């Protein structure tokens, strides 16, 4: 018999009754029922119940074991009586009457419980992550993560993609966040950078004559953490294809993404044909470029009802600013003064002056609007608003006025808040859509210059002619995002493969030819030697797994994550290094940095 086990702790069934077996694992819990000891023995695969009575030669040792000790047991498989069968466990019809026990490893007093999975402070969980990962939910999360990544790889390979591994030590380049820098010992005073994304490498693979690339790529960005973004390191499904247009990417990647969601959605419906929504439409209807389409609320421009109205606040805003609009945010079933007042208080807590609103009631077969706005704009305009918005008795609507560029984000937050408060959001589905036609540039008011709105390597719609003839702020890019349930889960684009257009695009953003050649020299050179049209995308693996597992925090689906302060509490990183190491690198740490100031 094997030194440690003949079976794992999930393998034995009723047909194994009578067998002499050997199991090894962790003591999940111990129970004493009338002098008979019951031990739940746990390993990676599951749990088997071990039984020891006072007559067993192993009883004296079993009495001593405690939670999370590691033991080996030898014994006989016996059938449980019908009244004590555990239908929750696959092994619930049997138990092992123990004959021999060996203690393989003892455990100190636990800093957090493994059995029962109560809430526990996150910093303790991260410091003792090896214990946290023994808990059933966390263990399942990590195994599901592996299953999803395996399914992604299989699907990509089945669709003709080849997996390549790109370097982790590269040159620093601006990708929208700070780089993690790695000092060079051989070339003192110079630094490598960990890649924020394999953007240039994957494009260079297309220059190298490869056709369809993918990689589950580690990416490193020194940015502030959020619940839906891990500090430091994250993983993305990186994809690039040669000789493609935007539609080719959609036709190829949409079935792959849909199949992954369907395989791991636990029966929840998944969008079959992903709608294409322009960036401008997404902002106007949903107040976000990553709309949650499970929320049925669609915002509308209702400015025409407020021009020259007696609701002077909105009328003056429209008169004083030609770009001003009034947006309506319908709230089906929200037609009570209490709810409207609650929303108003919430808006004020968000730093806003408040929310205008109307709610409707039906009196003697006639709809009546209530609230300050209805009182000021009159019955005719109030009814016209109700008809346009498709509202009924018991419904409400909230209003925001001003320049949409300034209030659209808040309007989107109002839409989300209403959907959550009124339970309008369908929590039992995955709603996916492509967001397309992103603006190429945006205006940086602080620096009085153009910035890239998205990826600087994308192809401008209209090509070279548009670059030369159009107002840069009206340019659209062949740039797209894939969104799901209010999260951006992928981003991509058709790439610019012309060196002349590359220079023109970066010149518009204030970067000279010399800067482009310095920061993106490899890509710029490659464009001079026969560059194929190409495009692709990158999908956030961690975020997709988070959605499929139904958790709110990425740390729940990552093995050894940092905390919110970008500290690795398990490995005590970042850490001090020795003076000798610093001397080898030609680095001296400033006194202020040593003191943490």
From Swiss-Prot:
It holds the Pfam family tRNA_anti-codon. Residues 199-202 are annotated as: Aspartate. Coiled coil: none annotated. It catalyses: tRNA(Asx) + L-aspartate + ATP = L-aspartyl-tRNA(Asx) + AMP + diphosphate. The record marks 33 as: Important for tRNA non-discrimination. One of its GO terms (molecular function) is aspartate-tRNA(Asn) ligase activity. Keywords: Aminoacyl-tRNA synthetase, ATP-binding, Cytoplasm, Ligase, Nucleotide-binding, Protein biosynthesis. L-aspartate binds at residues 175, 221, 454, 495. Belongs to the class-II aminoacyl-tRNA synthetase family. Type 1 subfamily. This is Aspartate--tRNA(Asp/Asn) ligase.
């Amino acid at each position: 018999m094997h030194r440690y086990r003949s079976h794992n702790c999930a393998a034995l069934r009723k047909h194994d009754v009578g067998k002499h077996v050997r199991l090894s694992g962790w003591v999940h819990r111990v129970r004493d029922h009338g002098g008979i000891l019951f031990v739940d023995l746990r390993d990676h695969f599951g749990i088997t119940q071990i039984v020891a009575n006072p007559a067993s030669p192993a009883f004296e040792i079993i009495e001593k074991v405690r939670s999370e000790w590691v033991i080996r047991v030898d014994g006989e498989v016996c059938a449980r009586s019908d009244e004590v069968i555990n239908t929750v466990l696959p092994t619930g019809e049997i138990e092992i009457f123990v004959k021999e026990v060996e203690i393989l490893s003892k455990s100190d007093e636990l800093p957090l419980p493994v059995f029962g999975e109560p809430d526990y402070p996150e910093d303790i969980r991260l410091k003792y992550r090896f214990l946290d990962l023994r808990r059933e939910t966390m263990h399942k999360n990590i195994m599901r993560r592996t299953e999803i990544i395996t399914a992604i790889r299989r699907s990509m390979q089945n669709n003709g993609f080849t997996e390549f591994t790109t370097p982790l030590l590269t040159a620093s380049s601006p990708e929208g966040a700070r780089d993690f820098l790695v000092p060079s010992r051989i070339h003192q005073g110079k630094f490598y950078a960990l890649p924020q994304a394999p953007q240039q490498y994957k494009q260079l693979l297309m220059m190298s004559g490869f056709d369809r690339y993918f990689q589950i790529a580690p990416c490193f960005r020194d940015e502030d953490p959020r619940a839906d973004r891990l500090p430091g390191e994250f993983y993305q499904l990186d994809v690039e294809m040669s000789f493609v247009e935007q539609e080719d990417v959609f036709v190829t990647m949409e079935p792959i993404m849909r199949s992954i969601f369907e395989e791991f959605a636990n029966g929840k419906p998944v969008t079959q044909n992903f709608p294409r929504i322009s960036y401008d439409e997404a902002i106007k209807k949903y107040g976000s470029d990553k709309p949650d389409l499970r929320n049925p609320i669609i915002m509308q421009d209702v400015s025409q009802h407020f021009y020259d109205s007696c609701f002077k606040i909105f009328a003056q805003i429209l008169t004083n600013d030609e770009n001003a609009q009034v947006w309506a945010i319908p709230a089906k079933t929200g037609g009570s003064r209490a709810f409207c007042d609650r929303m108003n208080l919430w808006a004020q807590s968000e730093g806003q002056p408040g929310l205008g609103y109307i709610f409707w009631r039906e009196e003697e077969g006639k709809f009546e609007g209530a609230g300050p706005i209805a009182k000021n704009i009159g019955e005719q305009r109030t009814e016209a608003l109700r008809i346009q918005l498709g509202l009924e008795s018991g419904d409400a609507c909230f209003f925001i006025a001003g320049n949409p560029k300034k209030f659209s984000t808040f309007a989107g937050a109002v839409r989300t808040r209403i959907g959550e408060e009124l339970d309008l959001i369908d929590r039992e589905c995955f709603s996916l859509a492509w967001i397309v036609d992103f603006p190429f540039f945006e205006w940086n008011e602080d620096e009085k210059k153009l910035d890239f709105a998205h990826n600087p390597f994308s192809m401008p719609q209209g090509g070279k002619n548009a670059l030369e003839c159009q107002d840069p702020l009206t340019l659209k890019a062949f740039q797209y995002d894939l969104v799901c349930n209010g999260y951006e889960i992928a981003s991509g684009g058709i790439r610019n493969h012309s060196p002349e257009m590359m220079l023109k695009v970066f010149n518009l953003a204030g970067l000279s030819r010399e800067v482009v050649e310095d920061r993106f020299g490899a890509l710029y050179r490659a464009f001079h030697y026969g560059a194929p049209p190409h495009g692709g995308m990158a999908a956030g693996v961690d975020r997709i797994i988070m959605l499929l597992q139904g958790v709110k925090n990425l740390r729940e689906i990552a093995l050894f994550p940092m905390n919110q302060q970008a500290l690795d509490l398990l490995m005590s990183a970042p850490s001090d290094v020795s003076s000798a190491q610093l001397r080898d690198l030609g680095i001296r740490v400033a006194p202020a940095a040593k003191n943490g100031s």
